[in-house]
C-alpha cells in the first residue's frame, strides 16, 4: 500500500526519477529481512531525505512510514533517526500475538509510552489481553494515550481467566473508562469493538461519527446501551453478542443510517424494539424474545436461530417484514409442524432452513409440512435445507412405502431454480417433500441431495480424508437407495440431479 501511495506522490516528478524510485522500493521489499527501510538514508538535519536522486519532503516520508505495517515501522525507527521521530506519530497501532503474556504487555507498554499520542487513528488488540488486577493499570494508561480526538478505531479484546461469562459477579472484569469518550475525544471514532469487559456509560458519549459498534461478552444494561445510541447518529452496524445485563434493546428512530442489527445469546434479553426506519438486515439468536419490529419495510435479509424459529417465522414474519428477500432459519427443535401461512412472502428469493438437533431432530416433526412455506413464497429461487443428524428417528420410507402423500391443491412454482438438501435421509416425509418439489416446480434446474453432512470431502483435493459420518453411515447408504428407488425416476431431463454419496475410501464400516 505504501508503494502505491509513493507512486502517486511522485507522479509529478520526472519519469527517470519515478522509475528509479519504483525499482528501489521493489528491490528493498524483495531483500527485506528486517525492514523495508533498511536501505533508506538517514536525514542529517534537513527537511529533505534523499536516496539515489530521490528528493522528497519530510511529510511525504512521514506518510510512507505511516503506511508500513507496525513491525516494519518499528524496525525502521531502530535503524533511522529520522524514522525514529516519525515512529512517535505512527497512526495505526495493531498488536497481535498467539499467546499474550507479561513480556507482550511490557512491549506494548514501551511502544505506547514512546508514542506521542498525536495522530493515532487505530488501536487494535486483536489477540486479546489476559486481564487481572495488574493489567488494569496498563490498560488505563494505554487508553489514556491512544484515545484522542483523532482516533477512528478501537478494538479491545480481553481474555478472562473466568470462563463463566454469565456469572452475576463482575468484580474481576475490566471496567472500560467511558469518560475517555466524552469531551470530544470520541468525536472521530468510527468503529468501537469491546469484548469481555464492563461498559457503563453514565453520560452521553460524543460518538457522532460512529458507524459500527460491536460488543461481545460485555456487561451493559439496556439503559446504558440507549445512552450510547442516543448520540450515535451515523451508526450503520450494531452487533451485540453474549451481552449480559440487557433486558430490552430499543433502537431509536434517530438512527436513520442503521442498516444491520445482530443480537445473539444475550440471555437476559426479553424485548427487541426497533424504530430505525432503514434497517435492512437483522440476525438474532435468542430464545423467547418479543420482537417489535415496527414497520420494517426496508428489511431485506433476516436470520434467526432458536427452538421453534420455523413456526414463529411462518406465523409472524409475512406481515411484519413483507419485503423480505433472504431468510435464514435455524432451529434445533420444533414443537409442532410448520403451519399454513396466514399471508405470503411475496418477495422472498432465498430460503435457508437448518433443522439440526444435538443428536436427532424430533421424530414427530413432519418435513412434508415445509410445503406450506414453499407455497407461501411465489418468488422463491433458491431453497437450502439442512437436516443433518447423528441418528435418524423418523419413519423410513422403507418401513412405510405405501401411498406417498400429495397436496390436495397444487401450487406451481415458476421461479424456484435450485434446491439443496444436506443430510438427506430415508425419512418418508423428506422423500415426500422432495417428490412434491419435483412434481410442482417447472423452473427447477438443479437438485442436490447430500447424504453426508455437507462438510469436508477428499474429492475436492483440499482435504486428505472426508469428515466422518459415524453412525449415520448405514442411514446414508439407505438414503442413496431411497433416491434411486423413489426420486430418480421423477427427475425431468431438464433438471440436473447431483447426489453426494458416502466416500468409498473414507466412509467404510470398520
Model segments located where?
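Leucine-rich repeat
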Residues: 2, 7, 39-247, 252, ...
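C-terminal capping region of solenoid repeat domains
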Residues: 2-47, 165, 381, 391-402, ...
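A structural signal for leucine-rich repeat
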Residues: 144-145, 167-186, 204-210, 226-233, ...
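Leucine-rich repeat domain C-terminal region
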Residues: 291-306, 414, 423, 440-444, ...
